[in-house]
Amino acid sequence: MIDCRYYQQNECRSCQWLEIPYSQQLAEKQHHLKQQLISINCDKAQWLAPFQSNEQCFRNKAKMLVSGSVERPILGILKNPNDPQSAIDLCDCPLYPARFSIIFSILKDFIGRAGLVPYNIAKQKGELKYILLTESIATGKLMLRFVLRTENKLPLIRRELPKLLEKLPHLEVVSVNLQPLHAAILEGEQEIFLTEQQFLPENFNSIPLFIRPQGFFQTNPKVAEGLYATAQQWVSELPIYNLWDLFCGVGGFGLHCAKALQEKWGKPIKLTGIEISSSAILAASHSAKILGLEHVNFQSLDAASVIENKNENKPDLVIVNPPRRGIGKELSEFLNQIQPHFILYSSCNAMTMGKDLQHLTCYKPLKIQLFDMFPQTSHYEVLVLLERKKIN
């Protein structure tokens, strides 16, 4: 069991399974996964052992609500959103890398020097709402984002930034995000970069990836790297020359698979990636360029748009990595119609995935593996390789 004083003192209960031995956590998650797939014929599928995570220090990102005063800021959570006195400082949270606590101390000093008055939710006054800190495991470089209510403090931030960069030489990307609304929203639409660099380089399995401020990126890099490597391994021996990566994010799945397939078959592989986030598409396109993948087309679109494009060449493989709601009945039926030979389904919600697999009536599961992306909680990711059923 992790030694966490916040949990022991009942200050933070985000890690709801902290008292459950890790081996039991994995067993319960595996049982839950099998229950979600009970209506699917998995008799001939290969069930691989769960991919384990480190139990602590596994997160690469900290999302810290800022409260307290400008002289004594508190970085962490509010147990009661309407009560500033309920603030809990989580700078020593054992889920973060050890050096984050030192960085937080430096950032508290910066908050005072720049006069960033913490936003008071009850009074609807103040400026600084959140601090978001992300680390690249490949380089050790950092991305720092200040979520502010207005632009009023930008001149002071710019004035103090050179001193902060001296204290934190690994700080590669710094930005201000404007979120003017009095609402439980983490970030707004406008991002103001304060450094020349606008993305944080990462590298999984020799695939360059780029973390952008408003793009989604997994928070458990060790398990994410294992997830991508497994996907790459599963498809690398299959006869695939044209693949779609739907909900592609920064391109992790598609780039891993396309690179392995191109090396395997010695010919260009066609990759089409679809993602609604334009910043993620920029990152994915940059990665493809570095890898020298020529027949790649990443587009900033809703994944459902592929249903309307009847002229697109039909793929051999479709990768889907949807949000928690799953891919839904309409997209499932579309995949049944175009019948790619294989579907690779990555899910963060086994319940909706189970429903989607019921709709994918033309497919049978070949391989299934759980990835423990979120230890100390009931959440997990799962990867399933599906093959088109043979017509008798």
From Swiss-Prot:
Catalytic residue positions: 348
Pfam family, one: tRNA_U5-meth_tr
UniProt gene name: rlmC
PROSITE patterns, per the entry: SAM_MT_RNA_M5U, TRMA_1, TRMA_2
Its job: Catalyzes the formation of 5-methyl-uridine at position 747 (m5U747) in 23S rRNA.
Top-level taxonomic group: Bacteria
Keywords: 4Fe-4S, Iron, Iron-sulfur, Metal-binding, Methyltransferase, rRNA processing, S-adenosyl-L-methionine, Transferase
InterPro entries reported for this sequence: 23SrRNA_MeTrfase_RlmC, MeTrfase_TrmA_AS, MeTrfase_TrmA_CS, SAM-dependent_MTases_sf, U5_MeTrfase_fam
Example of a GO MF term: iron ion binding
Classification via NCBIfam families: meth_trns_rumB
Entry EC number(s): 2.1.1.189
Keyword Transferase among record annotations: yes
Stated name of the protein: 23S rRNA (uracil(747)-C(5))-methyltransferase RlmC
Family per record: Belongs to the class I-like SAM-binding methyltransferase superfamily. RNA M5U methyltransferase family. RlmC subfamily.
A biological-process GO annotation: rRNA base methylation
Broad enzyme group: transferase
Residues bound to S-adenosyl-L-methionine: 218, 247, 275, 321
Catalysed reactions listed for this entry: uridine(747) in 23S rRNA + S-adenosyl-L-methionine = 5-methyluridine(747) in 23S rRNA + S-adenosyl-L-homocysteine + H(+)
Binding site for [4Fe-4S] cluster: 4, 12, 15, 93
